[in-house]
Amino acid sequence: MRPILLQGHERSITQIKYNREGDLLFTVAKDPIVNVWYSVNGERLGTYMGHTGAVWCVDADWDTKHVLTGSADNSCRLWDCETGKQLALLKTNSAVRTCGFDFGGNIIMFSTDKQMGYQCFVSFFDLRDPSQIDNNEPYMKIPCNDSKITSAVWGPLGECIIAGHESGELNQYSAKSGEVLVNVKEHSRQINDIQLSREMTMFVTASKDNTAKLFDSTTLEHQKTFRTEPPRELAALSPNYEHVVVGGGQEAMDVTTTSTRIGKFEARFFHLAFEEEFGRVKGHFGPINSVAFHPDGKSYSSGGEDGYVRIHYFDPQYFEFEFEAREAGSPSG
């Protein structure tokens, strides 16, 4: 499995995301650049210029007309995907950590960090109402007093958002009233990543407590746990198979004194039902900061602390592989 190497950032990758069809791959990093690439061959299609700080999050709407980005320059920006023109600039009091379009692409949400005396907020804007954008007045703003949001996605049908917190809590906020619909605490440390399944019926979380976990999207009921040795800080679900890819590795501050083997910088593949690891992919020099499956399930991409994005197309053996679970008490060897 020889990867396509994308080099378009000078700093560590913070998030990568495919559009719905999977022909485009958006990448953001701890530099002010937002890149878009053709996923089939790794050609850079263009760059969205305007941010002045690290960009933490990116999302594209359902029909890939608009792109949304959130940055440490205390702003969330809306872009025309095709031309790269900035359509809206929403200023905030602190860094924007997460952002996303709802199912219809009409409503955007973003969360801000708890820093410099400002508390964490989740803001909702309706793009069909220009006055909200012009006046920087969201139709709803939810305060998060206890623990800041570190990852968030829209839930099924855009009725709620699912947010992971620094404390390890998972919340479901209503997109209409802002009330907390469900609250669970299955992780003991910060939740760094939340990614939905293709049907949006379940989602996977990855935390600094060395686990990735599978949840029901509606009830937030905990289903499965994938345990690993170093902190696994991100995870993604395959759209075609019962597979989970998880990535991460040793903290970036320790990387210079660590070999890639000891630092556990590879992506690991787990079976969704059996919770067992069945494969690893190496390549990055340093921790993996973001992973995403292509919507067709034939490839996946990873972005690392080394500033590179790698597009991995699976070998034929991957599609022929059948996982056989051992019965309890049967010999292992």
UniProtKB/Swiss-Prot annotation:
What main location does UniProt list? cytoplasm
Which GO annotations describe the biological process of this protein?
formation of cytoplasmic translation initiation complex; translational initiation
Q: Which residue positions does Phosphothreonine occur at?
A: T219
Q: Could you tell me which Pfam families the record lists for this protein? A: EIF3I
- Its signal peptide is none
Residue numbers bearing the N6-acetyllysine modification: K264
**Could you state what the record's PTM comment says about this protein?**
Phosphorylated by TGF-beta type II receptor.
Q: Where is this cross-link: Glycyl lysine isopeptide (Lys-Gly) (interchain with G-Cter in ubiquitin)?
A: K282
Choose one Gene Ontology CC annotation of this protein and give it: eukaryotic 48S preinitiation complex
Q: Which residues carry this modification: Phosphotyrosine?
A: Y308
Q: Where in the cell is it found?
A: Cytoplasm
Concerning Gene3D superfamilies, the annotation shows:
YVTN repeat-like/Quinoprotein amine dehydrogenase
Where are the WD-type repeats located? 8-47, 50-91, 144-183, 186-225, 283-324
User: Which domain of life does the protein's organism represent?
Assistant: Eukaryota
Does this UniProt record's set of keywords contain Cell membrane?
no
Q: Which InterPro entries match?
A: eIF3i, WD40/YVTN_repeat-like_dom_sf, WD40_repeat_CS, WD40_repeat_dom_sf, WD40_rpt
Alphabetic keyword roster: Acetylation, Cytoplasm, Initiation factor, Isopeptide bond, Phosphoprotein, Protein biosynthesis, Repeat, Ubl conjugation, WD repeat
Q: Which GO molecular function annotations are given, in alphabetical order?
A: RNA binding; translation initiation factor activity
Q: Quote the subunit structure annotation.
A: Component of the eukaryotic translation initiation factor 3 (eIF-3) complex, which is composed of 13 subunits: EIF3A, EIF3B, EIF3C, EIF3D, EIF3E, EIF3F, EIF3G, EIF3H, EIF3I, EIF3J, EIF3K, EIF3L and EIF3M. The eIF-3 complex appears to include 3 stable modules: module A is composed of EIF3A, EIF3B, EIF3G and EIF3I; module B is composed of EIF3F, EIF3H, and EIF3M; and module C is composed of EIF3C, EIF3D, EIF3E, EIF3K and EIF3L. EIF3C of module C binds EIF3B of module A and EIF3H of module B, thereby linking the three modules. EIF3J is a labile subunit that binds to the eIF-3 complex via EIF3B.
Against PANTHER family, the record matches this protein to: EUKARYOTIC TRANSLATION INITIATION FACTOR 3 SUBUNIT I
Recorded hits in HAMAP family, A to Z, give: eIF3i
Question: Hey, which family's this protein in?
Answer: Belongs to the eIF-3 subunit I family.
| Role of this protein | Component of the eukaryotic translation initiation factor 3 (eIF-3) complex, which is required for several steps in the initiation of protein synthesis. The eIF-3 complex associates with the 40S ribosome and facilitates the recruitment of eIF-1, eIF-1A, eIF-2:GTP:methionyl-tRNAi and eIF-5 to form the 43S pre-initiation complex (43S PIC). The eIF-3 complex stimulates mRNA recruitment to the 43S PIC and scanning of the mRNA for AUG recognition.
Recorded protein name is: Eukaryotic translation initiation factor 3 subunit I
- Which organism is this protein's natural source? Oryctolagus cuniculus (Rabbit)
